[in-house]
């Protein structure tokens, strides 16, 4: 399980005995998370300090315990908001070379249609002194994925994802 831009997500800790987890984020986030988790018994979780906007980010992943000959799930929730379109495309292109066919990628993206969710995310980013660097149409995103040899299997809107996956998890 590759958790890109893992932040302070705790998903990995619930499933650490069932899979190997790679928490991937900026150096300062990973260092802070390591410090906060130093007294927690953590197995099968590897923290990787990676700047995904850099060309050579993939080398850090490949030098870890990541095994490209095994199926994996890559979570990139919230990531596409903070990379330029070119950075996001390059990242996907590099990653796709090292994903075993049948692996899955899960991500959300800011839409060019000014949805309520996109406006909320823009406001949250601004409050965190960040800015959203890109917005996508579905057709544009589909083309980017195609160029990276990736295929959309399922596309759901914010409301459906919340109802199916998040609501029951948080109740």
List each language-model region with its residue ranges.
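Alpha-helical subdomain
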Residues: 2-171
């Amino acid at each position: 399980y590759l958790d890109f831009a893992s932040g302070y997500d705790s998903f990995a800790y619930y499933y650490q005995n069932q899979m190997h987890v790679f928490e991937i984020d900026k150096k300062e986030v990973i260092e802070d998370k390591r410090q906060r988790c130093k007294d927690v018994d953590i197995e099968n979780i590897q923290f990787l300090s990676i700047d995904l906007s850099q060309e050579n980010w993939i080398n850090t992943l490949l030098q870890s315990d990541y095994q490209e000959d095994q199926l994996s799930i890559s979570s990139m929730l919230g990531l596409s908001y903070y990379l330029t379109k070119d950075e996001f495309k390059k990242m996907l292109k590099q990653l796709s070379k090292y994903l075993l066919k049948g692996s899955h990628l899960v991500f959300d993206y800011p839409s060019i249609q000014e949805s309520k969710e996109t406006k909320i995310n823009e406001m949250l980013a601004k409050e965190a002194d960040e800015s959203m660097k890109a917005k996508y149409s579905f057709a544009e995103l589909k083309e980017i994925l195609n160029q990276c040899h990736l295929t959309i299997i399922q596309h759901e809107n914010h409301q459906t994802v919340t109802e199916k996956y998040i609501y029951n998890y948080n109740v």
